[in-house]
């Protein structure tokens, strides 16, 4: 297994990037499909996702869907189920790791340069150089 800690390489636009978002896989839960519809336009716009990446995005959306499904189930319980809570935490960790992999977190977006402001910081006395 590859060592995943430390500084990650910068994400760059891919020559084979998708230009149109494919429909959400039919087997995903409604919450997972909603997440697919939320993130795919961002990924397509940044040109960092290829057809080969779709399984990873599908796994990310499935993990988010599972987190929401468990949360809904736990909200109906008078006392939270610790086993369900542990399962939810594992799904959250998986979703967070996959989100970072595809540029869906603030730090990973900065590597892509997708959310960087275009304005010039020359006049900013607090700018780090």
Segments (PLM) and residue ranges:
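Amphipathic alpha-helical protein-protein interaction segments
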Residues: 60-67, 74-118, 129
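Arg/Lys-rich, low-complexity, intrinsically disordered N-terminal tails that contact nucleic acids
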Residues: 1-37, 108-129
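Glycine-centered secondary-structure boundary/capping sites
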Residues: 6, 47-48, 103
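An amphipathic, hydrophobic-aromatic interaction surface with interspersed Lys/Arg
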Residues: 25-76
């Amino acid at each position: 297994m590859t060592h995943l800690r430390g500084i990650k390489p910068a994400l760059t636009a891919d020559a084979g990037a998708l230009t149109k978002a494919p429909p959400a896989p039919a087997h995903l839960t409604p919450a997972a499909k909603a997440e697919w519809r939320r993130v795919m336009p961002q990924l397509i716009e940044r040109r960092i996702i290829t057809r080969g990446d779709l399984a990873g995005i599908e796994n990310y959306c499935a993990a988010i869907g599972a987190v929401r499904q468990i949360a809904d189930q736990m909200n109906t319980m008078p006392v939270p189920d610790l086993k369900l809570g542990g399962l939810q935490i594992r799904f959250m960790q998986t979703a967070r790791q996959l989100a970072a992999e595809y540029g869906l977190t603030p730090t990973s977006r900065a590597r892509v340069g997708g959310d960087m402001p275009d304005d010039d910081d020359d006049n900013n006395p607090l700018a780090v150089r």
